[in-house]
Amino acid sequence: MTLASESLPLSGLKVLSVEFYGAGPFCTQYLSTFGADVIKIENSTQGGDFARTTGPNSLGPEDSLYFQSFNQGKRSLSLDLKDKKGKEVLHRLVAKSDVITNNLRGDKPEQLGLTYSVLKEVNPKIVCTHLS
C-alpha cells in the first residue's frame, strides 16, 4: 500500500467479491478506488468472469477493455466454490476479511454458502452484501 492509498477513506478495508459482469465489478471498482483491498473471486470451472471476453478486445482475445475498466485495482483468484478445497480457501479469506459481496442470482449465494448464516461461523464480524 502506498502513502497516498493509506489516506483514502476505505484504506484497510478487506473486501471479497464473488462477482461477474455488471453490478458486482462496478460496485467493487468504487470500493477499490476509495482504498479498499478487493479480491475478486472468479469461477474456475467456467473460465472466470465472462466479461474477460466481452468486446472491445483491443488488448488481446481474452483481455477486454470492458473487463479491465471495471476490475482495475483489484486482485483476483479463481476458485470452484462447489469444491471442498475451494470452500476451504474461501473460508480462510473470509476469516481475514471485513466484507464479502456477490452479484449472483437469487438462490446461488445460499447454494454456495455465501450467506451470513454460514459465514458467521468463520468470521462473526463479516458483513455480507448481495447485489441484484
Stretches found by the model and what they are:
Residues 1-132:
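N-terminal helix-loop segment corresponding to the beta1-alpha1 unit
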